[in-house]
């Protein structure tokens, strides 16, 4: 359990204390990643099934790595090689996999609400690895962990989220989590890529990039979610990059010296971020990837019923 939760589906559901429970444990889990032998017996005998209906590099490999470091058995399932291609429904697929008695189902799906639907029909814990444009809770948690690690705290800090906010499940999870940890959130992007009503969550909305990043402690850059966009919402990527992309000159002129830059990946280099910025000293993007393993270890440990001090044994 994470606090009162059997599942990890949306950070909208999580309290400040529950978010801190995960990232505090992740700090301990990260120590395991620094060891020569990256293996602990915490979830020996447990099974984690990764159920991915959408392409993924970082998230699926991160959950698989997290499970294996904790000594759990990990089964990777992809829709292209399954009975889904023969017309099997999501619920039937999940129930058949659950009949194999896994302890945790990790699911990514293009439809918002899919993990919650699955959770209503299975007895094991369910973790959302991203559902449509709804949420991506483990990414939100690893962003919280990375920011706390780099900034010391989120209390009183300002985070700017820039790009295709409307179609970004990462932005939604971050927007639900950051204010609970005391951070102020600014959203910036084209008006056509800004969801309605985000002000009620405490965020301020900007269309001017310089204004949005002025004095920010961290900037999270988002890619354009072409796969979720029907009609064109911007004139073109070149024009988008000129207005909302972050290059070395803008970073040097507009960002304060201590500001760090994050990106959930994959990066469209030369669009939202120039290579010089993505690979530069402000970037903590690869730290996010490493921290993602630690955070997902913490999630699996808490939900699969890891015992005692074995997490750090």
Swiss-Prot record:
Q: Top-level EC class, please?
A: transferase
Q: Which UniProt keywords apply?
A: Pyrimidine biosynthesis, Transferase
Q: Which reaction does it catalyse?
A: carbamoyl phosphate + L-aspartate = N-carbamoyl-L-aspartate + phosphate + H(+)
Might you give the EC number(s) for this enzyme? Answer: 2.1.3.2
Q: Where in the sequence is the signal peptide annotated?
A: none
Q: Which GO terms describe its cellular component?
A: cytosol
Does the record bear Transferase in its keywords? yes
Report the transmembrane regions from the record: none
Q: Which GO terms describe its molecular function?
A: amino acid binding; aspartate carbamoyltransferase activity
The UniProt annotation places carbamoyl phosphate binding at: 58-59, 108, 136, 139, 265-266
Q: Which GO terms describe its biological process?
A: 'de novo' pyrimidine nucleobase biosynthetic process; 'de novo' UMP biosynthetic process; amino acid metabolic process
- Looking at the record's lineage, which domain of life comes first? Bacteria
**Similarity annotation:** Belongs to the aspartate/ornithine carbamoyltransferase superfamily. ATCase family.
Q: How does it assemble?
A: Heterododecamer (2C3:3R2) of six catalytic PyrB chains organized as two trimers (C3), and six regulatory PyrI chains organized as three dimers (R2).
**What role does this protein play?**
Catalyzes the condensation of carbamoyl phosphate and aspartate to form carbamoyl aspartate and inorganic phosphate, the committed step in the de novo pyrimidine nucleotide biosynthesis pathway.
Name the record gives this protein: Aspartate carbamoyltransferase catalytic subunit
Taxonomic lineage is: Bacteria, Pseudomonadati, Myxococcota, Myxococcia, Myxococcales
